Amino acid sequence: MATPSGREDSSSQTPGHGKQGSGACVEQLDHPEKLEVEMPDQSAMWKKAQEFFQTCDSEGKGFIARTDMQRLHQELPLSLEELEDVFDALDADGNGFLTPEEFTTGFSHFFFSQNIQGEEEADQQVAQLQEEKVYQSRGEEDVGDMDHDEEAQFQMLMDRLGAQKVLEDESDVRQLWLQLRKDEPHLLSNFEDLLTTIFAQLQEAHEQKNELECALRKKIAAYDEEIQHLYEEMEQQIKSEREQFLLKDTERFQARSRELEKKLSAKEQELERLNQKQRKLEGQCAALHNDKHETKAENSKLRLTNQELARELERTSHQLQEAQQQLESLQREACELQQEKEMEVYRVTESLQREKSGLLKQLDFLRERNKHLRDERDITFQKDKAAKANTAASKASRKQRSGSVIGKYVDGRGILRSQSEEEEDVFSAPRRRSSVGLSAYLQAEEDLGTGEPGSGVPRRQALRRIISIEEDPLPQLLEGGFEKPLSRCPEEEEVSDQGTERQSVAAPVLDLIPTSPRGQPVGKETLYKEERVPSTPDRLFKIVFVGDSAVGKTSFLRRLCEARFSPGMAATVGIDYRVKTVTVDNAQVALQLWDTAGQERYRCISQQFFRKADGVAVMYDLTAKQSFLSIRQWLSSVEEAVGDRIPVLLLGNKLDNEKEREVPRGLGEQLAKENNLIFYECSACSGHNAQESLLHLARLLKEQEDTVRNDTIQVGPPAKKKSCCG
């Protein structure tokens, strides 16, 4: 016979028969108006049927085939066989496809049949609930009669098992015992045996627990006794340590007291000495007090003397300031004089340049005149043609090369005069010193050599230009003209015999000796008209170009000054110079560019020009390794003459001839880095780095001069000394 609790458990295991389900059914029975079945709306049903048809007809054919229905296998929880059964049920005519009307009609019939089945199941549930309600009411009446007997039996069981000592709440066990007694009576004895075993084990565990608690209490008591013993021992040790510490402290205090007594006695003795010293100092102070009056009187005298000295110092300061102002005025005047001197040097240099150009034009005129006279001479001496040819061939072996200065100026030479005799005359000429600088003059001398046999050519005078190497270059050609006029002028002629040799043929005597000093040279008037008056430069620097022969110094200077290149130029003899004006940082800078001869016999002249140079340019040939090896010798000459106080420009020329290079760029850079030089590789032929290198050197010279001017020592007024006595 089932109890209410048993019905609740069994109903909870069956779906649709739980408390909620039974309650809902009873509520429906109590309210029969809620049992009305709400039918779905007809339009909603038709709409759902159409949506399901469109889902099946994904291709939009207007009908559904069996394959379309099988595609829903993945979307619906139905197997293929079930889907085929649905298709067969909807296909009433059996034509193998479903139209929208057939699908909607079949779907509505299926829906209505499901609703009818649901109503029948609902009726069955209502009937079952009514039966359960009747059964429940009968069970409650039986429980009322049996409660008293079951409670007595359960209490007897608990007393027999001794559960009161183990369990505090017997409700759970009572409920389980009653459930088994009602539902499963045959299992009740097993349950009671299980309870007997469990309670026996619990009783045993309880006894073990009591034993463990007793052992634990004994252990705690023993531990407390041990702790108490340790505490007493610690108290005894602390007491003994305290007594020892007090004993040591007493001894230490006594020793400290004795030490302090000794120090006190020493301090008393020191105090006595200080008292004696104080008495002595008081006596000295009294003596010093007497001296104080004397010192005051002396200080008064010194104060008066100090005032007089201060007034004298002030007068001296005023005089020193006046002297300083005069010194500054003199410095300004000296600076102005220096600038005027530089401008004068520049103007004289320009005049010398124009004089040189005029002389060149005069030489051209004389050459033309000599050619005309030579033609007349050839007609006159046709009979002696063979003898003259032999004489010219003998002179070809002793020809000399024309220099850029001495060669371009008229260099009078005899017909039979050799190059060695020429050099001997030049260097044996007396050197002249000038307070201004370079002394250049023209000297006409008679040639002692004889003319050609039978030609009747008299002795001629040659034009000589001697350059002083002792002082600054300041030509004095404009200070009164020449002592002797230009009387005779030889001509060097290049006679090409199949491009193999040159012959120097002497020109006949020109009877052009005037009685008065020479005036303007031929073509000089035209030169003054063609040349534009240059602007006054702000700075003037002298730069000396040195290097082995044939490295291209003259061609480089011609490229700088004339912007052209002339191949096959003759070697420089002696010294030549040019003037180049450049603009550096908005300032006009005039550069005197001195071209020196590279031959060994002219090096003594070149080295003398280093002393007054502002800068030096050392050049070598990129295609000749020997010229680069000579650079160190040139640098040694510069260092011996001027030390390291002037900048040096290292130039590697003939960069245009890269195929024949023998000196790598790295060697030049390394040499420049070791000796602190300015390094450029240039080309006189193409003009590459010609202007750039010169501007770099000019800018460096200008910066050095600005630094020297700014570092000029300014003498300031001396600081006024304070008097010692106020």
Curated annotation (Swiss-Prot):
The keyword Ribosomal protein does not apply. A lipid is attached at residue 724 (S-geranylgeranyl cysteine). The keyword Zinc does not apply. Residues 567-575 are annotated as: Switch-I. Residues 78-113 form the EF-hand domain. Its cofactor is Mg(2+). Its EC number is 3.6.5.2. Residues 1-30 are annotated as: Disordered. GO terms for biological process: activation of store-operated calcium channel activity; adaptive immune response; endosomal transport; positive regulation of calcium ion transport; positive regulation of JNK cascade; protein localization; response to histamine; store-operated calcium entry. Mg(2+) binds at residues 554, 572, 595. GO terms for molecular function: calcium ion binding; GTP binding; GTPase activity. It holds the Pfam family EF-hand_7. One of its GO terms (cellular component) is vesicle. Residues 202-376 form a coiled coil. Ca(2+) binds at residues 91, 93, 95, 102. GTP binds at residues 549, 551-555, 566-567, 572, 598, 653-654, 656, 684. This is EF-hand calcium-binding domain-containing protein 4B. The gene is Cracr2a.
